[in-house]
Amino acid sequence: MSQTLKSQDTNMSDSGYRDPVEDSQNVLGNDPSVNSQAQDPIVTPSNTVEAQTLHPTSDLKEDHHEIGAKGQEHADTGDRAESSEEPALEKPPLDKAELERSPSSQDTEQRHHPYSEHVGGDTLVLDPNYSQSDLGGRADAHLESSSAAPTEGAGEGGEAGAHLESSCAALPVGADEGGRANAHLESSSAAPTEGAGEGGEADVHLESSSAVPPEEAHLESSSAAPSEGAGEGGEADAHLESSSAAPSEGAGEGGETAQNLLAVDSTDAQSPCHSSAGPGSQDSLRRRLPVTEAERHEEETQLVTEKEEVAQETLRKTEKKSLWTYGSMFLGCLIVAVVLSSVNSYYSSPAQQVPQNPALEAFLAQFSQLREKFPGQSAFLWQRGRKFLQKHLNASNPSEPATVIFTAAREGKETLKCLSYHVANAYTSSQKVTAVSIDGAERALQDSDTVKLLVDLELSYGFENGHKAAVVHHFESLPAGSTLIFYKYCDHENAAFKDVALVLTVLLEEETLEASVSPRETEEKVRDLLWAKFTDSGTPSSFSHMDSDKLSGLWSRISHLVLPVQPVKNIEERGCLL
């Protein structure tokens, strides 16, 4: 077919035809009547051609990623695409010659895939149902178009059908062999009908083959022989190959239009090239999805394992802490138990028991009974008297003897004598002996030195014989000088007998002693009475005589405890039963 078309072009050149498009432009440019008639036909075909051209270009961007699909569906999808595109093309009415030619042209077009263009190495199919595998089934992609002859009165403007396809320089996915394709633009112009002007029709088809192994794509068009009455306009065959960038001679304005469309579409075709990586990247993402899920599962497993390890470590630490805590508590309890057991065994063992003080026990037993015999006494007397004497009895090595002064008014004379005697006997009850008793009222008129000697003999004899207590009644009635002997027995550091008790009684000159009197007041009353009795300004000062200084020393040694005694009616009436 290609050889036939080339031979026809040679014959037409030999017969005197130059460039129909150029000649028609020159003639029509000089004829104003033709120019006015040519304006209308130019607009409609141009718009139609643009619709035919721009629509595939937009489809080119959308369907570029579908290149390289199944090969067996190429022919069928081509037929469906052609049938869908034909209503969109608005062609002028055909004359009889074209009607006779159209069946063969349609048959030829059905054998080729419509709107299939090859540019720069990639095959682009504008049919949305066309799959990429069709490239593998077909060896050649053919684009064929029939150009319709202009109607009567058509001017120099001819239809320029420019079909542009561009593809990326990169090979499509699935291409196993690389190669360069040769692009051929073959067109034949339809014969002008009767009354046609000089204008001809030039169809410029640009076709570029894909990078499939060397195969050629052909653009073929059937041309009808020129009919009678044809003008100077002839047919323009433009053969544009991929090696040549400039249009051939005679292309005229149609060639420039094709070049412009080629430049625009080649620029727009670059974006599908970059977007062609989309399906591949999606497939890669799909292929990577299981890997990502596996990695995520692996990470989750690692996280769970780490959490379990942390929990186990926490449990270990808690167990260690609990062990240390409970262990320390148990150890502490054990130590406390051992200490308590040791203390209990220490105090409960017979060898370590503190020996009981029989003198103290006997005193406490006797002293507790005195409360019943001498009712009406102050609590101070019982508490302070028991505490003072008990302390002295508890001391294993006392530093001085226990000296107590009981005092009472005249109405409590018998009660004072009886109570002091029972207290002294209670103190010495453990020795099963009675206390030494000295009455100062009986020796009031005797010589001071004699009384002093007698008092010394009685006290020393009694203490030496086991009598641990002595009672000196009416201490205020003794001669003043004789009382100096008590320095010997009541000294703080150099007392002759330190483990004994001396009970002294002082009868006040007052008739009654109030029960509410305080211990301090009682002590002052006793002190004033002794100073009045033992210090006399008319008595000469001598070693054997009492003075205020000596009395002050004596008072400091005997006044450790001064207790008031209230009279008991029964004892005052009947006397003290010793």
Swiss-Prot record:
Pfam families in alphabetical order: LAP1_C (PF05609), LAP1_N (PF20443)
Location in the cell: Endoplasmic reticulum membrane; Nucleus envelope
Disordered: annotated segments: 1-255, 267-287
Lumenal side: 344-578
Annotated segments matching region Interaction with TOR1A: 344-578
Gene Ontology biological-process entries: endoplasmic reticulum organization; membrane organization; positive regulation of ATP-dependent activity; protein localization to nuclear envelope
Residue ranges crossing the lipid bilayer per the database entry: 326-343
Residue(s) carrying Phosphothreonine: T301
Basic and acidic residues biased stretches: 58-101, 108-120
Modified residues (Phosphoserine): S24, S104, S131, S271
Purpose: Required for endoplasmic reticulum integrity. Regulates the distribution of TOR1A between the endoplasmic reticulum and the nuclear envelope as well as induces TOR1A, TOR1B and TOR3A ATPase activity.
PANTHER family: TORSIN-1A-INTERACTING PROTEIN, TORSIN-1A-INTERACTING PROTEIN 2
Name this protein carries in UniProt: Torsin-1A-interacting protein 2
Organism of derivation: Rattus norvegicus
Taxon lineage: Eukaryota, Metazoa, Chordata, Craniata, Vertebrata
Name of the encoding gene: Tor1aip2
